[in-house]
Amino acid sequence: MKKQTLFSILAAAVVIICGFATSCSTESEGAKANKEVLNDTFVFYANLGEINKKGGFDELLTESNRRLLATIIASSSEGADYEEYAMKLLADPSESGINYDTPIYGYLNVKDDSVSLVIVADVENAKNVDKFITFLEEMSGESVGAVRKGDVRQFSIDDLHIAYNNSRLVAVADESLDYGDSPNKVIAKALNRPDADLSAYEKYDIAYSVNIKKLVDILIADKQRRLDYSYEYLAVCDEWEREWEMEYINSLEKEIEMLKNSTKDFEENARATIGITSKAGRIVAEMSVDGYNSEYKLDKKVSNEFLEYVNNNALLVANLAVDGNMVSEILDKYFTAEYAKELGLNRNEFNLYVGIASDAFKSINGDMTLAINDIKNKPYYGIEQINALMAVNVTDDYIISNVSMYGAGILDSYGANCYGFNYDDTLIMLGQKQDTLYLTVNNDFRTRSNSAASKAWVKDVKNSHGYIVVDVDNVLKNDFIVSTFREEFEKDDYYYDDYYYEESKEDKIFNELAYKAIDKISYIYLSITSPTSVELVVVMDDKQTNALKQYVDLVKPYMLTILASEAL
């Protein structure tokens, strides 16, 4: 184990446990004045107090459980008896000196070739932090050698540099600080920086945010360094290496050019944000981009008119509102012969396929719906048999007429504008009825008396531009999927090369938890809510209880069992 690694592990464990043992408070409007909006390359945000409140983590720490956990935490202490201090710490996390009522956040400090991660937390009582550090030193048997300058205490643990004063604690992690700013400079900047305006993240429990142009600049700089090195190497390498090296150089130059062009529609401070929030009956992950300006507008929304053709027991349904003319215009503008050259493709073949796709999309205007109704395995073969459907709104018969022309001799005719073929007991049909183009696999295109249009998830996605829904309730009724899941995760004890392998207790617990966790889910959907935002939502069977609380309650009995075994 590297020097002071045990200290790092203990510190992280105790800080997290304390964070989940506290309550949260809301910042007043007046306190938000004179704060700095974080426009760093990367920003991380976590509201541990809110997470605890929603998940009920503090319910795990009853008096007896705190005593048990305190015994475990203090068991490695070789000096004074710290069990009572650990008890106080778990009962009142403010004893650590860190303010858990305010969110913690982090950002990237970028300087030349160096990128360092900075984590910031508010300090409530610096003297209590001193005592907390001493406690961790005693438990780990390692001294961190903290140095004090004025009201700043600072120490290093391997490549982790930590400092705190009377109001703020910062942790800086990076192995490459010697090539950019020194740890002292990064720490000084972090300690003296204005308070952060975190209002953009307050609606989330956890959030990650990236400045798109700054991130791309980092990627370009990295590739440019490799390019510079390759040119230097090209000047001295052997003749037989030159061809390969030139190919690599050309590839890097193309990648750099593509990266430079990738941000032309983004404003200078455009940011991409992923925020996760636990709510009653659901977990929501929202992905959004601010500062993106495109000449193409995503105005069309799904009508869901094809759901009446989809079985109520469908495993997966995907739907996208397509403006075919806009897609065709994008294909013609960006997928050019020059683009084919950049990708190293045959330009004539590329132009042919892009032209076919462009013409086909001109015929599409409206919903493009895909449904997988069932998956079965064939006995003895283990081959999946799929029952699926795809339906598309079209404005003319361009696509079906080309199918009949190019599919002659391959496809069988099943009537007017209906073609198909049978392969290994799989019947694939392609046809058109009025303004609907359809493709079925082991299915027939007709309305259902008990269709997916009546499913609960329909109301969640009805105003979207597109979505994908996995109906977990139906998935868990599918014998093939369930048996495949169990075969993958529930390995029995077995012999291999005369060795006996026994599934560990931890593996058994994990497998049991995994299945129970999935069983709590009703459905999962990914929805395009606006031209620049997407939501991934996990919807639980229990719609009243906070989703995080449901999972904490699920894990609770297992955690207590593990704690008891660790204490023995």
Residue positions per predicted region:
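Single conserved position on a long alpha-helix in the C-terminal lobe of the eukaryotic protein kinase
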Residues: 44, 94-204, 361-465
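Hydrophobic helical h-region of N-terminal Sec-dependent signal peptides
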Residues: 11-16
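C-terminal motif of bacterial Sec signal peptides marking the signal peptidase cleavage site
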Residues: 19-23
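Structural boundary/hinge residues at secondary-structure and domain interfaces
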Residues: 25-154, 199-380, 552-568
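Long, C-terminal catalytic modules of enzymes
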Residues: 452-568
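Bacterial N-terminal signal peptides that target proteins for export
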Residues: 2-10
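Hydrophobic lipid-interacting interfaces of membrane-associated proteins
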Residues: 49, 174-178, 213-217, 290-294, ...
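Broad, structure-driven detector of short, well-ordered beta-strand segments within folded domains
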Residues: 104-106, 160-166, 261-279, 368-370, ...
